[in-house]
Amino acid sequence: MNQKSVLITGCSTGIGRCLALGLHARGYRVFASVKQEKDIAALRAAGLESLALDLRAPDSIRAAMDEVLARSGGRLYALINNGAYGQPGAVEDLTREALRLQFETNLFGTQELTNRVLPVMRARNE
C-alpha cells in the first residue's frame, strides 16, 4: 500500500493531536512530532508514528527530518506546522529572552523545518 506520509508538529495535545488522529483514520501515514519524549508513547499507542522534535533546536530538526525520511523512504506528502506556543503577559512585562524563545519556536524553527521539507516534496512532485 502506498500511503501518503504527513509530518505534523505539535501533536502532544489539542489541534495537532486531533489532526494526527484524524489523518491516520483516513489512511495517511502520520509522523506525529512532539517536543517532549514522554509524549511519544501515548501517540504510538494510538497507532501513530511519533518522534521528538524541538523546533528551537536545529539539531533536533535535522535529526527528526532524517528519521522521517528514512522511515518514509524519502517521501513526504505534507507538512503541517502546528507546533507553537503562546507567551502570555503584557509586552512590557516580557523579557527579551522569553520573546526570543517564542520566536525560535514559532518562527525560526518552523521556517527551518519548512526549508528542509520543501525540496523533498518538490523532488517527488508531492
Where are the predicted features?
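Active-site loop of short-chain dehydrogenase/reductase
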Residues: K4, G74-L76, R122-E126
